[in-house]
Amino acid sequence: MSNNNNNNNNNNDEENSKLDIVKKQFQEKEKQRLQSKLEKREISNKEQIDQSSSNIASETLLLINNLSDDIENRLNEISNNTNENKAEDLKESYNQMEESLSEINSITTMSSHILTSYDVKSILENIDNLRKQIDKSKEKYMPKQKLSLTRKKTKTTTVSTKTTSSKEDTNETFNNNNNNNNDNDNTDNNNNKISTEPIFNLINIKGFKNKELFYPPKKEEEIGNQDINNNNNNNNNNNNNNNNNNNNNNNNNNNNNNSNSINDLFISDLTDCTVILDMKVLTALKINNLVNCKIRANSPIDGSIFIDNCINSIFSLVSRQIRIHYCTDCQFNIFVKSNPIIEGSKQIKFSSYLQNLKQQQQQQQQQEQEKVLSSFDNKRFKEYSFDLESNNIDSDKWKLVNDFDWIQQKQSPNWSLVEY
């Protein structure tokens, strides 16, 4: 009886063992089946992702090509309609081209992870080519009006002097011609001296060290054209009443030049200087070769700003577009309508124009030198569609920097943000 029970137990154990084996085999097969299913699903998802990335890359390239074509079409239109181009229309076209170029660079930066290295290289080469075309077109079709007007006035004065002299008797004509020749020699010598001396007038600020300058200058403050103006006045003193009338007209023209209607300004070769721009508006601003300087604009630049080769300087500016080339250790407190662009630059900091202004007012409101800062008037800016105080689509563009030397998706090491 006992033997029978033992046999039954053994049989049960064997059956249970077989069942366990079968169960394990089934579980193993089920695991393999699920693993295979997951692998197939992953492959399918990857194919879909690859296809989606390919579609996105194609759409990105198409968008970039459309923007590039638009820039080229605008350049061709300007070139083909040279006689019909108006200054305001040209300025608007160039501003739109600058914004399109900035958008191309921004799109390329954000999409570099889905574009091939060949595509990225081609796009960057195209950006550089378009930049050169735009600069060349600007140089050709947007001449510097203020400089040409000044030259014409000088020529007019000289002709009028000669005409009056020709009406005098022979002896006086001979004497006056000798005097005029001497005056011309003095003018040439003075011009040679001026070229190496600082300049401060309506179109140029150049060559100063350790100075605080307020722009626009008053007539008596202008440096660089004074000798020429004095020489013209001496010639005019030898003329008759008709020439005195011409002299009055010239003075009226000079007074008009000192009005708030100003075009381009070029600032260059300054060291340890502070420049306060307090004009009504500028159409363009070019800055080059500054060391340890501060530039602040209390009014907008209704166009582009180009800044090159500056070191350890601070800029507080409002404009439609700003391009920064080959600068080191500089801070830009700005409000812009398109993404700032840097190239060949390092240790660059960006902050908000208005936030920086308010911080300085709080820290230095008791110092006399900061009276200029307290003169902030948003109406000046709103007149040219720059609203600094309300929250709008341009409020944060100061921080959306495009670094032409950095095409990776992660943050460029060449610039950083200063927030208050």
From Swiss-Prot:
Pfam families: TBCC, TBCC_N
Compositionally biased residues, Basic and acidic residues: 31-49
Coiled-coil ranges from the UniProt annotation: 9-142
Alphabetized UniProt keyword annotations: Coiled coil
Chain residue ranges for the region called Disordered: 31-52, 138-193, 222-257
Source organism superkingdom: Eukaryota
A biological-process GO annotation: tubulin complex assembly
InterPro entries per the UniProt record, alphabetical: C-CAP_CF_C-like, CAP/MinC_C, TBCC, TBCC_N, Tubulin-bd_cofactor_C_dom
Residue ranges occupied by any C-CAP/cofactor C-like domain in the UniProt entry: 216-366
A GO term for molecular function: tubulin binding
Gene Ontology cellular component terms for the protein in this record: cytoplasm
Subunit composition and interactions: Supercomplex made of cofactors A to E. Cofactors A and D function by capturing and stabilizing tubulin in a quasi-native conformation. Cofactor E binds to the cofactor D-tubulin complex; interaction with cofactor C then causes the release of tubulin polypeptides that are committed to the native state.
Protein name per its UniProtKB record: Tubulin-specific chaperone C
